[in-house]
């Protein structure tokens, strides 16, 4: 199964935030954001930190695509 984070990138644009701003606000590493940019998997802890920082749910930042 593949994970798509297009919703997250759109949300950042809507909030006028850069990826480095997300890292700082959520307390996550730039490596995690890079992984997400490449469609890689990150821990649920990272996703939870992003959701808390952006005041959203996981459905708002990601989508699981069937193989």
Write out the residue ranges for each language-model feature.
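Residues in the helix-turn-helix
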Residues: 32, 46, 60
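A short, Lys/Arg-rich alpha-helix, primarily the initiator
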Residues: 1-20
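The alpha-helix within a helix-turn-helix
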Residues: 12, 23, 51
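Recognition helix of helix-turn-helix/homeodomain-like DNA-binding domains
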Residues: 28-42
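Residue-level detection of the helix-turn-helix DNA-binding "recognition helix"
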Residues: 13, 27, 38, 66
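Short C-terminal boundary/hinge segments that cap the last helix of small helical domains
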Residues: 55-67
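Short, basic-rich loop-to-helix N-cap that marks the start of a DNA-contacting helix
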Residues: 39-52
